[in-house]
UniProtKB/Swiss-Prot annotation:
Superkingdom of the source species: Eukaryota
Family, similarity comment: Belongs to the BPG-independent phosphoglycerate mutase family.
GO cellular component, one term: cytoplasm
GO biological process: glucose catabolic process; glycolytic process
Transmembrane feature ranges: none
Tissue specificity statement from the Swiss-Prot or TrEMBL entry: Found ubiquitously in germinating seed.
Cofactor note: Binds 2 manganese ions per subunit.
Pathway assignment: Carbohydrate degradation; glycolysis; pyruvate from D-glyceraldehyde 3-phosphate: step 3/5
Subcellular location: Cytoplasm
Keyword Nucleotidyltransferase: no
Name of the molecule in the record: 2,3-bisphosphoglycerate-independent phosphoglycerate mutase
Keyword Aminoacyl-tRNA synthetase on entry: no
Length: 556
């Protein structure tokens, strides 16, 4: 029939309840040991959900195919997680989109590739990005395919600017990745393509800063990649990585910037007028700052010295709000008819809040990579400024309590039927690898949840508490059997990345109709099932193409 925004009434659940939708960032479920910061932390609120109402607590999948990523080995992340939570359906995402475009060859027919190809005759193609198979920001096999494809489509001179990982993969693996890359480049040279590594550095020290935390990181990369200037000069990437790990004893994440030079000591690949540049990461957050420096004419955050006239494209578009970069090799998923848009069309007043580092997740990504309000009369979004210029283990409580206070006030105001927040501690503090600080962060997050639940109790509302992916629940690298791994000196290897763990979802509150419980027939439920669940709690049936609801209402 004819499309309509109007949702059918739920046969058993009433409309008009105030619903708190709480997303704990980086909060998975794992076995309770000393590396599970959620277990170690005092988290009485989250514990009570599981203990007191087991029929209203369960685990859902937040990684791999459940969120549109290629395989079950792909960790979830905040962007795809919030897309799934808000959209109610599973869309091919990030790496998967790139895989499909590379496999079909569509990537070479797109506007973005054609744009960079215009420079192949006279200029150099530069590829900049994270060199690892971590699958969080980039994947080595995609770089390998793109190198091969670019050469087949006419690139005559190629320079690769590598960023070493050691954060999403084990420290020290960058040597092997560099060896693989250099072998591929050697094969291209045998085929007559002038291809080599031009520069490099560790991801946390060179280029890959995020949220404008430290522009010096981007400047160090710019100096090496664009200007060909760096404190260290080497003949090859493998030599560079090996030597810098010995002296100044840097780990992969923090390798100082280096350039590759020829026998005369001249850098082999600065970026100059007439060149093409592609940033090969598919994940956006740590490419946005470099993209600004490469694209914005009137950029003044640091002195670029030279602003080369180049054709620049991202692997994907990194910021839909800023339309940045304006050219990209792979188009984003078209996410239409998100739950937020439906609910606003059906009279649900909505409040959303987080601090800067996750504000975009609870708004832009939740709404299907779309900026702004659906209807400003019906919605209010509040951003609390995050602490800047520090790593979050220094302030592990972050703005959890401030976010909860805003949510509480919104709930008690009576103006909103949905109050949606993201509490970032588990993820942002977990990424620092500081176990003690992460424990403090998890406790603060639990206190924030309590404050929101208390407000829901006061207004007779309903709460839904879940997470977007794991992080804080497992802070150690493990071997295949699950045993913690140590480095050569016997020191435990800390895991700073997201995980493959499922995440909890709990529902409750005085407004919840008695007899509502989780269904037993959706064992593989994931984040995308949450949207239909929340629509039901608002008193509506979900659209027929949404992933099925997790709940049922049984007559008592």
């Amino acid at each position: 029939g004819e499309f309509t925004w109007k949702l059918a009434d739920h046969p058993k659940l009433p409309k008009g309840k105030t619903i708190a939708m709480v997303v704990l960032d980086g909060w998975g479920e794992a076995k309770p040991d000393q590396y599970n910061c959620i277990h170690v932390a005092e988290t009485p609120t989250m514990d009570s959900f599981k203990k007191t109402a087991p029929e209203r607590w369960r685990l859902i999948k937040a990684h791999g195919t459940a969120v549109g990523l290629p395989t079950e080995d792909d960790m979830g992340n905040s962007e795809v997680g919030h897309n799934a939570l808000g959209a109610g359906r599973i869309y091919a995402q990030g790496a998967k989109l790139v895989d499909l475009a590379l496999a079909s060859g569509k990537i070479y027919e797109g506007e973005g590739f054609k744009y960079v190809k215009e420079c192949f005759d006279k200029g150099t193609l530069h590829l900049i990005g994270l060199l690892s198979d971590g699958g969080v920001h980039s994947r080595l096999d995609q770089l390998q395919l793109l190198l091969k494809g670019a050469a087949e489509h006419g690139a005559k001179r190629i320079r690769v600017h590598v960023l070493t990982d050691g954060r999403d993969v084990i420290d020290g693996t960058s040597v092997g990745f560099a060896e693989t890359l250099e072998k591929d480049l050697e094969n291209l040279r045998e085929k007559g393509v002038d291809a080599q590594v031009a520069s490099g550095g560790g991801r946390m020290y060179v280029t890959m800063d995020r949220y404008e935390n430290d522009w010096n990181v981007v400047k160090r990369g710019w100096d090496a990649q664009v200007l060909g200037e760096a404190p260290y000069k080497f003949k090859s990437a493998v030599e560079a990585i090996k030597k810098l790990r010995e002296e100044p004893k840097a780990n992969d994440q923090y390798l100082p910037p280096f350039v590759i030079v020829d026998e005369n000591g001249k850098p082999v690949g600065p970026i100059v007028d007439g060149d093409a540049v592609v940033t090969i990461n598919f994940r956006a957050d740590r490419m946005v700052m470099l993209a600004k420096a490469l694209e914005y004419e009137n950029f003044d955050t640091f002195d670029r010295v030279r602003f080369p006239k180049i054709h620049y494209a991202g692997m994907l578009q990194y910021d839909g709000e800023l339309k940045l970069p304006s050219h990209y090799l792979v188009s984003p998923p078209e996410i239409e008819r998100t739950s937020g848009e439906y609910l606003v069309h059906n009279g649900v007043h909505t409040f959303a809040c987080s601090e800067t580092v996750k504000f975009g997740h609870v708004t832009f990504f939740w709404n299907g990579n779309r900026s702004g309000y659906f209807n400003p009369e019906m919605e209010e979004y509040v951003e609390i400024p995050s602490d800047v210029g520090i790593t979050f283990n220094v302030q592990p409580k972050m703005k959890a309590i401030e976010i909860a206070e805003k949510a509480r006030d919104a709930i008690l105001s009576g103006k909103f039927q949905q109050v949606r927040v993201n509490i970032p501690n588990g993820d942002m503090v977990g990424h620092t690898g500081d176990v003690e600080a992460t424990v403090v962060g998890c406790k603060a997050a639990d206190e924030a949840v309590k404050m929101i639940i208390d407000a829901i109790e006061q207004v007779g509302g309903i709460y839904v508490v879940t997470a977007d992916h794991g992080n804080a629940e497992d802070m150690v690298k493990r071997d295949k059997s699950g045993k913690p791994m140590a480095d050569k000196s016997g020191k435990i290897q800390i895991l700073t990345s997201h995980t493959l763990q499922p995440v909890p979802i709990a529902i409750g509150g005085p407004g919840l109709t008695p007899g509502v419980r989780f269904r037993s027939d959706i064992p593989t439920g994931g984040l995308a099932n949450v949207a239909a669940t929340v629509m039901n709690l608002h008193g509506f049936e979900a659209p027929s193409d949404y992933e099925p609801t997790l709940i049922e209402a049984v007559d008592n």
